[in-house]
């Protein structure tokens, strides 16, 4: 038996179909729009994606470099370990001493040392924090007052006139690269001389004396002699500063020269003496500590 719909039913079905078809069409349109928007966005993102890929490539290379560095020597981790060890083993057990040092310093010694990493004055001579005011430069040179201001003589002025140190030590050492540069440098100063060459030429007088006295020796032996002569010259140059010379005359400041031999861990020492009659100064009292 055939089943037929009434007029009202046909109208409802027809309306429903139209509604469904309209919804379907709208959904299709929305999907198409979204696809077009997505496509446009993707096109806009292409350069950004390319940059990201390039950046990732750079990051990968950087990470590879980091991995190589970390496997060889992780500097920051090592420094962190050493600092915390210092705090745990030295700072905390003597915290009152370090709190006092945080307020002020009153060192009795001024050291002019070489910048060489193998020769730390505090390590070699056993100075504790607050005991020695230290300045280091290439070849531990002290220039005379007429040469003008340097970081070394400015530190000297502060140590002597403000901190009122009682001893000044010029500390040199064997196998000094600065003195080797001085000895190997030609006696004329070229226009393109490096900063190191120009600085070490402040020791030229010691070089010339060494060449005159030991020209028959090997280059290395001449360097050893020049290292000591340079220390003596720096000691004498200290007297060109009136605020040092006057204190030495009054016995308030003593000046010493030290030569540390890296090969056998010996220390050769001199002292600056003065002639009371005419206020002349000379190097004396040579000692060797070994």
Curated annotation (Swiss-Prot):
A GO BP annotation: carbon utilization
Location(s) in or outside the cell: Mitochondrion
Tissue expression remark: Strongly expressed in aerial tissues including leaves, stems, flowers and siliques, and, to a lower extent, in roots. Accumulates in guard cells.
Keywords of this entry: Lyase, Mitochondrion, Phosphoprotein, S-nitrosylation, Transit peptide, Zinc
Residue numbers of Phosphoserine PTMs: 122
UniProt cross-references to InterPro entries, sorted A to Z: Beta_CA_cladeB, Carbonic_anhydrase, Carbonic_anhydrase_CS, Carbonic_anhydrase_sf
Ligase among keywords: no
EC number: 4.2.1.1
Entry similarity comment: Belongs to the beta-class carbonic anhydrase family.
Function: Reversible hydration of carbon dioxide.
Name recorded for this polypeptide: Beta carbonic anhydrase 6, mitochondrial
Protein's organism: Arabidopsis thaliana
Source organism phylogeny: Eukaryota, Viridiplantae, Streptophyta, Embryophyta, Tracheophyta
Gene: BCA6
């Amino acid at each position: 038996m055939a089943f037929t719909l009434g007029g009202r039913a046909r109208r409802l079905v027809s309306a429903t179909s139209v509604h469904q078809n309209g919804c379907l069409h709208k959904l299709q349109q929305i999907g198409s729009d979204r696809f077009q928007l997505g496509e446009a966005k993707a096109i806009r993102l292409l350069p950004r994606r390319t940059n990201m890929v390039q950046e990732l490539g750079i990051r990968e290379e950087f990470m590879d470099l980091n991995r190589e560095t970390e496997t060889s020597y992780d500097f920051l981790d090592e420094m962190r370990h050493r600092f915390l060890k210092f705090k745990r083993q030295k700072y905390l057990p003597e915290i009152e001493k370090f709190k006092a040092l945080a307020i002020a310093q009153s060192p009795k010694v001024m050291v002019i040392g070489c910048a060489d990493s193998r020769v730390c004055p505090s390590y070699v001579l056993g100075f504790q924090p607050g005991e020695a005011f230290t300045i280091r430069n290439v070849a531990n040179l002290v220039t005379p007052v007429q040469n003008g201001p340097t970081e070394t003589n400015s530190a000297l002025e502060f140590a002597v006139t403000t901190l009122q140190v009682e001893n000044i030590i010029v500390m040199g050492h064997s196998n000094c690269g600065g003195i080797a540069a001085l000895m190997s440098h030609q006696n004329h100063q070229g226009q393109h001389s490096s900063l190191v060459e120009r600085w070490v030429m402040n020791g030229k007088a010691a070089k010339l004396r060494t060449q005159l006295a030991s020209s028959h020796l090997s280059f290395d032996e001449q360097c050893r002699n020049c290292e000591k002569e340079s220390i003596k010259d720096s000691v004498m140059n200290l007297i060109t500063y009136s605020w040092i010379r006057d204190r030495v005359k009054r016995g308030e400041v003593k000046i010493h020269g030290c030569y540390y031999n890296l090969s056998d861990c010996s220390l050769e020492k001199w002292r600056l003496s003065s002639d009371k009659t005419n206020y002349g100064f000379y190097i004396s009292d040579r000692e060797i500590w070994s």
